[in-house]
């Protein structure tokens, strides 16, 4: 059973145990989660796919799904994830298939649930971090539109952007 703070934020998951760091990357992640509430790993593009960034700690701190986004540079992705974290601190919740423009003026984005089959490959640090939980942690992918504001599931979406963000809502 989770315990809620006076703000309604999740402060502790009953079966969560902080993992033990085995290297400097782990120590940095655990330090960031302790100090800021979350950490943002960035994975660079390679032959298997586009770059992506994701949160570690949103579920522990806020009871909110972790967030992943693809195809944006590290500084921009980090800015978006930190903006989401700032909104979570005020009690805002982002839900699947909820289009929003609160992250950037004139820029809408949407959120889709990430299929659990993608967790190990794309959210490996989250899998490590939450391994003590009896149930899988939730995760959402932030999906951004093409230059005309269309999303990948819309018929006129600019096909050139498909290579920058693989949709992870299906296996």
Indicate where each model-derived feature is located.
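Acidic, proline/glycine-rich low-complexity IDRs
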Residues: 2-49, 59-63, 68-171
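A short, structured beta-strand/loop element
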Residues: 53-57
């Amino acid at each position: 059973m989770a315990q809620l703070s006076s703000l309604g934020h999740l402060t502790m998951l009953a079966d969560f145990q902080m993992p033990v760091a085995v290297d400097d990357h782990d120590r940095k992640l655990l330090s960031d989660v302790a100090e800021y509430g979350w950490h943002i790993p960035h994975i660079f593009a390679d032959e298997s796919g586009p770059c992506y960034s994701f949160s570690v700690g949103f579920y522990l701190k806020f009871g909110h799904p972790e967030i992943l986004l693809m195809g944006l540079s590290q500084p921009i992705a980090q800015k978006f994830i930190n903006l989401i974290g700032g909104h979570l601190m005020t009690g805002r919740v982002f839900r699947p298939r909820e289009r929003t423009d609160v992250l950037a003026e004139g820029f809408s984005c949407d959120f889709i649930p990430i299929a659990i089959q993608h967790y190990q490959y794309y959210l490996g640090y989250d899998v490590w971090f939450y391994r003590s939980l009896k149930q899988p942690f939730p995760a959402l992918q932030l999906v951004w539109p093409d230059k005309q504001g269309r999303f990948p599931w819309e018929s006129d979406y600019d096909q050139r952007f498909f290579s920058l963000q693989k949709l992870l809502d299906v296996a």
